[in-house]
């Protein structure tokens, strides 16, 4: 089904460079220096747990009972000045085969088999999954977060045999926080998947992340949130907002940094599309493990880091 002519009339005005935004709304980009890819350490670790668990399942040599549906959550304790201190809790829920059968048809036998399955999965998470996860972490400050008092919650509801769309309804757009920053930063509410780059729900969110990532990489701030707002049919954003959470390393105010963002980055939808090459067929990777912070991610940090750093070094001298 094609886009409504009423919407398309406002977006496609015949001037390709000034193509209007495909919808109204606010989009957020966030970055911090907690990890090498400028993502919150909580979400980065949760994604690493899931990709590693998938690798183990696909290899088919260990934890051979694994099935595709799984999710994770990592809780980290922070200091008062927002610095990660230690991992408090790791949750891993994974679908699995009925790999331990009950001795008979009684309820007691079924409960005993279910309990043994969960205990085996818990043991394998600690002895197989976690060592492989930690072996992939190169950052000493992230490794230092692991400790002997971590609470591991593995399949906390018990057995998990029925999964995927058969076990729960709906797929697209249900996990917009997992797709972005795991609760840090902000979110305008619009899902990404299923939308082309004329929809600023997707393209402007990628652009805001691109800006935030380059700002942190350039040393402007240890943490930054970039908010863009658009009106349907209008090319330029109606608002650009920046929040450095009091962790800026430059003399400029957040408002002055926002003005610098307007100067440095062309935020018209067509310009975003060109800068980030959003017409290339590269979206398959975003179907799982989030849209941001990927090694092979859509939104990559490019040479903008040097340009941002140069612009900031003159009017906003380091303090």
Language model segments and positions:
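Glycine-rich, mobile lid/loop segments that gate access to catalytic sites or pores
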Residues: 1-162, 288, 293-297
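Gly/Pro-rich active-site capping loops and adjacent beta-alpha segments
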Residues: 4-9, 18, 23, 174, ...
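Hydrophobic alpha-helical scaffolding
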Residues: 39, 111, 115, 119, ...
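Hydrophobic alpha-helical bundle architecture
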Residues: 179, 186-267
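Conserved small/polar residues in nucleotide/adenosyl-binding loops
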Residues: 305-312
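Non-catalytic terminal and connector segments of soluble metabolic enzymes
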Residues: 6, 16, 182, 266, ...
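Structured core elements
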Residues: 27, 73-75, 91-93, 151-154, ...
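Short glycine/threonine-rich loop-to-helix capping motif typified by GTGT followed
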Residues: 157-173, 229-256, 282-301
């Amino acid at each position: 089904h094609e886009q409504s002519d009423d919407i398309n009339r406002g977006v496609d005005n015949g001037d390709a460079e000034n193509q209007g935004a495909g919808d109204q709304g606010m989009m957020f980009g966030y970055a911090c220096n907690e990890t090498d890819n400028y993502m919150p350490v909580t979400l980065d670790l949760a994604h690493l747990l899931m990709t590693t668990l998938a690798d183990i399942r696909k290899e088919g040599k260990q934890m051979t009972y694994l099935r595709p549906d799984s999710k994770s959550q990592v809780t980290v304790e922070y200091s008062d000045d927002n610095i990660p201190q230690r991992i408090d809790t790791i949750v891993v829920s994974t679908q699995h085969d009925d790999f331990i059968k009950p001795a008979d048809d009684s309820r007691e036998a079924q409960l005993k088999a279910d309990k043994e399955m969960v205990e085996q999965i818990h043991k394998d998470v600690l002895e197989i999954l976690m060592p492989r996860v930690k072996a992939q972490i190169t950052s000493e400050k992230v490794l230092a977060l692991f400790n002997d008092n971590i609470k591991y919650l593995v399949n906390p509801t018990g057995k998990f045999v029925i999964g995927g769309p058969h076990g729960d309804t709906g797929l697209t757009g249900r996990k917009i926080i997992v797709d972005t920053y795991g609760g840090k930063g902000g979110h305008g509410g619009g899902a990404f998947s299923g939308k082309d780059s004329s929809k600023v729900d997707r393209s402007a969110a990628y652009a805001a992340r691109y800006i935030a990532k380059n700002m942190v990489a350039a040393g402007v701030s240890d943490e930054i949130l970039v908010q863009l707002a658009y009106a349907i049919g209008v090319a330029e954003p109606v608002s650009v907002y920046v929040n450095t959470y009091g962790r800026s390393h430059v003399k400029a105010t957040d408002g002055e940094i926002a003005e610098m963002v307007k100067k440095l980055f062309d935020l018209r939808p067509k310009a975003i599309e060109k800068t980030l090459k959003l017409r290339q067929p590269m979206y398959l990777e975003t179907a799982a493990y989030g849209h941001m912070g990927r090694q092979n991610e859509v939104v990559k940090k490019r040479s903008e880091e040097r340009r941002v750093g140069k612009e900031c070094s003159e009017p906003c001298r380091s303090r």
